[in-house]
Structure formats: structure tokens, C-alpha cells
Design a protein with these regions (language model features):
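Short secondary-structure transition/capping motifs
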Residues: 28, 32, 66, 70, ...
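Residues that scaffold, gate, or flank divalent-cation-dependent active/transport sites
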Residues: 10-44, 48-57, 61-99, 121
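Acidic, glycine-rich active-site loops and adjacent beta-strand->loop/helix elements
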Residues: 61, 107-108, 128, 140-142, ...
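Generic beta-strand or strand-like secondary-structure segments
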Residues: 80, 100, 123-126, 318, ...
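Short, surface-exposed, polar/charged, turn-prone segments marking secondary-structure boundaries
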Residues: 82-85, 130, 198-199, 365
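FAD-binding glycine-rich core of flavoenzymes that anchor FAD
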Residues: 113-137
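C-terminal auxiliary extensions adjacent to catalytic cores
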Residues: 2-24, 28-50, 135, 149-151, ...
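FAD-binding core of FAD-dependent oxidoreductases
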Residues: 55-80, 84-109, 135-157, 164-180, ...
Length: 476
């Protein structure tokens, strides 16, 4: 059943997940339709007034903003195709992200702030039930705002519906892509953290780490709700442990700081979640129309910088840094589990060479980790004006930030898929039972690393397990 949208408050992160990941459609409710129609009527009464300048409606675009248009020029501009703005190229965004962008596009529309023609608004909503969306490149998004990407996404729609003043501008202006990208990152981060907790708990118990490292008393002492989440997450999964003798002294730093590093990742996830919720329901249009009941001053239409979401890239950068640090912990623990004098386990978990040797998995993890370090560089404002000329002189870096966190997250999944079989091997060589809460993970890992004597490369097995992890993360 389609989600009914009446107000901006209906554009929640939960609804975005249903639409973007679950493939659900949306319908504009009667209140939304009334608001859109009234706003359009009021807007059309404004555009002929000589005392009001409306960017891109009775003026030209970009460097032509100072030029006033006569009515015939206005309509010609409104109907002009946007092919020339679809100028970037490269790897396409996933379908789930495209659906999230269309969903977020409705925030400007639903209460009339975009003054979009009602039939165009209905056409935007209908895109979510008409099959695959137009392909949009993730690369080359170096323009001010999001006009390069949104031109790709809405170009077919503009070719099949009648456009009037401001309609084209309302489709390609604002920052719905930023809202969608940070929403996608936040949703995935929450699911991925559960996977991290599973694999880290499996590794900590495989190491036979003292349970006191995750003691509940630490929650109040550390005085941090995110660290408290991590401590509890590890305790829930490990439970009372295997019931035998525990390691008599402290585990290495990489295990003792697990909850701290997980806690920081949880903080980054929560921050991205908050910004996603704010952004999905935010009005970001330029120019933006103030319905009569919202006006504080005399202005009825104003130009804004709403198309530049500065918080979304910062939030995604924090996620990239967090998953990079998690990968560092994973690679250190993978190595320590195989280091007998440190782990108190059989050296190399009983297989110092030959087909059952797992030491090279830890080497591969260092490679993932180093690539992630490159991706974790801060995403700053672009340093040159380039094609912006007189007006559009600062680009939005939001696509860069999303692409980096997306790739870094995939690399973390590979690191976790490398650590899990090493941890499982430790249980097997010691005969200790896997905690009940982690038996599903153990079974999934064993499915991709069967103990059947078959000789095969480890890399493809890790890739298959990582792909399984990823499918679960993005499950609707």
C-alpha cells in the first residue's frame, strides 16, 4: 500500500526506508493537493508584478539573473529542456538512492513552498511506481547545488509533462540528493553496526578476553551513552561466555578499546540519523515561496542557499572515519588471534602453513584499511569556481562524501568477512562453544568457509561472505 503524504512531517527516515529500500510508492493526500494547488494559484498572481523579482522565473538563470524577462521569454525559459545540465558521467547511483531522492524531492512541494504545478507534483510522486528510475552518475557532481544530478533524474519527466514558470527550476533546485544520501548512509550505518557488534563479539570471545573488559559498571564510569550501547551490545552477544577459565590477564588494546571505537561509530551513526531526519523534511528550494500563513516580513518569494546542505557531507565524513577505525580494530584482532604467545591459543590457530593457513587474511585486511585511510580524508568545499562563472561559484561536495563512505563501508564489510572465519577457527581448535547469540553468524561464516577439505582461494570466499553481509544490511 502506498504511503500517504500530507505534510513535510510525513517525510520521515522510516518512510524513506520503506520507499527507497522497500520499493513502496507514495500518494499525495488531499491536504497536500490542496496546499499545492493554492500555492500555485497564489504564485501565478505574483509573477506579473513589476515590484517582485523571482530568480529563474522573471529573470534568467545563473549569470543571467540580473536580466528581467518579458512574459514570452518567461514561458520559453520554463519550457526549455535541461539536457545541457546533465553533464556529469561515471558510476551510477544505486536505485535505492534514486528512490530516496525522489521521495526527498517532495519536501519542497508538499506544503506549496516550490509552487510546483499540481500535475507536475503528481508526476513526481508517480515516478516511485513506474519501474526503474533514470540513471544518475555519482561522479562529476561539481556544480553549485544539485542541478547536474537532478537534471538526469527528472529529464524524462520534463519531456512528457507540460511545464510552466518555475516548474523546471523546482525539479532541479534544492538539496533532495543530500537528504537522500545522508539518509541512505544513516540507515545502512545502523544495520552495519549490528554486524560489527556480532563479529567483534565473536572475535572477543574467541580470544577468551576477560568479561570485565565489557562490564556494565563501565557504562556509568565512561559517562557516554554511545559507549554504553557498545558495552551492552557486546555483553548481550557474549553472554556468560563458554563457562570455563578465562584469560588471567588483560587482552591487547585492540580488544579493550572495542567498545570505545564502536561507541564513536554509534555516535557518528546517530548524528547522521539526526541530520537525515532534519534534511528529509526540510524546504531547500531556491527561490522559495512563503505561503501567506508563514510570512513574517514583506517578502513572498526569496532566493536562498537551501540547495547547499553543509551538514550532510560532514556527517558522512564522520561515518567514513568511524568505519575506518573499526577496520583497524578488526585487522589487529585478526592478527592477534593467530599470534599464539599473545592470544594463548595455538600458534596460527593450529595451522602455521598449508591450505588451512589464515594468516594472509590479516594481510589483506591491512590493504583494505589503507584504502579506507585515503577515503577518510575530509570532504571540503571545492577550491575553484570552474563552470559557475558569476553566480554559481561554490559546488556542493555531498556526492563525494557519500561515495567515500559507501566505498569505505564496503571495505569494512570485507574486513569483517575476513575476521569472522579467523575467530571461528579459534573456537574450533579450542573446542569452546560459540555463544548462542552468535551461532547464526557462525553458521553463515561456515557456509562460506566449509570444513570440507576443498582447496580454494580465500579471497573469493571472503567476498561472498561480505556480499551476504551487505545483502542483510540493505534488506528492506
Amino acid at each position: 500500500m502506498a504511503i500517504i503524504l500530507e505534510h513535510r512531517s510525513d517525510l520521515t527516515l522510516e518512510a524513506c526506508r520503506r520507499v527507497a529500500w522497500g520499493g513502496e510508492a507514495v500518494t499525495l493526500g488531499p491536504q497536500a493537493r490542496d496546499s499545492i494547488a493554492k500555492a500555485r494559484r497564489d504564485f501565478l498572481a505574483l509573477i506579473d508584478r513589476e515590484d517582485i523579482t523571482i530568480y529563474g522565473v522573471n529573470t534568467g538563470y545563473g549569470h543571467q539573473a540580473k536580466r528581467r524577462l518579458i512574459p514570452d521569454e518567461r514561458m520559453a525559459q520554463a519550457k526549455a529542456p535541461t539536457h545541457h545540465r546533465a553533464a556529469s558521467w561515471g558510476d551510477p547511483l544505486p536505485e535505492r538512492v534514486l528512490r530516496a531522492i525522489v521521495f526527498a524531492r517532495l519536501a519542497n512541494v508538499i506544503e506549496g513552498h516550490a509552487a510546483l504545478s499540481p500535475h507536475v507534483a503528481e508526476a513526481v510522486a508517480a515516478m516511485l511506481e513506474q519501474g526503474p528510475l533514470p540513471s544518475v552518475p555519482a561522479r562529476g557532481q561539481g556544480g553549485a547545488g544539485e542541478i547536474l544530478s537532478l537534471s538526469y533524474l527528472f529529464l524524462p519527466l520534463t519531456q512528457r509533462v507540460e511545464l510552466a514558470e518555475k516548474d523546471m527550476l523546482s525539479l532541479i533546485n534544492g538539496s533532495p540528493a543530500a537528504a537522500a544520501l545522508v539518509a541512505d548512509a544513516a540507515l545502512a550505518a545502523r544495520e552495519r553496526l549490528d554486524l560489527v557488534a556480532d563479529v567483534f563479539a565473536l572475535a572477543a570471545e574467541a580470544f577468551n578476553a576477560p568479561l570485565g573488559h565489557f562490564a556494565p559498571e563501565l557504562e556509568s564510569l565512561w559517562n557516554n551513552p554511545n559507549d554504553a550501547w557498545a558495552l551492552e551490545a557486546l555483553r548481550i552477544r557474549i553472554g556468560t561466555g563458554h563457562g570455563g577459565a578465562r584469560r588471567p590477564y588483560q587482552a591487547p588494546v585492540s580488544i579493550r578499546i572495542m567498545p570505545r571505537i564502536m561507541g564513536e561509530a554509534h555516535r557518528a551513526m546517530y548524528a547522521a540519523d539526526t541530520i537525515a531526519r532534519q534534511s528529509l523534511a526540510a524546504v531547500s528550494d531556491n527561490p522559495v515561496v512563503f505561503p501567506a500563513g508563514e510570512r513574517i516580513g514583506q517578502d513572498e518569494v526569496v532566493s536562498t542557499g537551501g540547495y547547499h546542505n553543509a551538514q550532510a557531507p560532514a556527517a558522512m565524513d564522520a561515518l567514513t572515519a568511524a568505519v575506518t577505525n573499526l577496520a583497524v580494530i578488526a585487522s589487529r584482532v585478526a592478527a592477534k588471534l593467530q599470534d599464539g604467545p599473545v592470544s594463548l591459543l595455538p600458534p596460527f590457530l593450529g595451522y602455521p602453513e598449508g591450505r588451512d593457513y589464515l594468516g594472509c587474511l590479516a594481510m589483506a585486511m591491512v590493504g583494505y584499511e589503507e584504502e579506507m585511510r585515503m577515503l577518510a580524508q575530509p570532504t571540503l568545499l571545492p577550491g575553484s569556481e570552474s563552470g559557475g562563472f558569476a553566480q554559481d561559484d561554490v559546488a556542493s561536495p555531498v556526492f563525494l562524501a557519500w561515495s567515500k563512505q559507501e566505498k569505505a563501508s564496503e571495505l569494512l564489510e570485507l574486513a569483517l568477512a575476513s575476521l569472522a572465519p579467523i575467530a571461528l577457527r579459534a573456537f574450533e581448535v579450542t573446542g569452546r562453544p560459540v555463544p548462542e547469540a552468535l551461532r547464526s553468524l557462525a553458521a553463515e561464516t561456515r557456509q562460506h568457509f566449509p570444513d570440507d577439505g576443498e582447496v580454494s582461494a580465500l579471497g573469493p570466499r571472503c567476498a561472498a561472505l561480505a556480499a551476504h553481509f551487505r545483502a542483510n544490511i540493505y534488506k528492506a
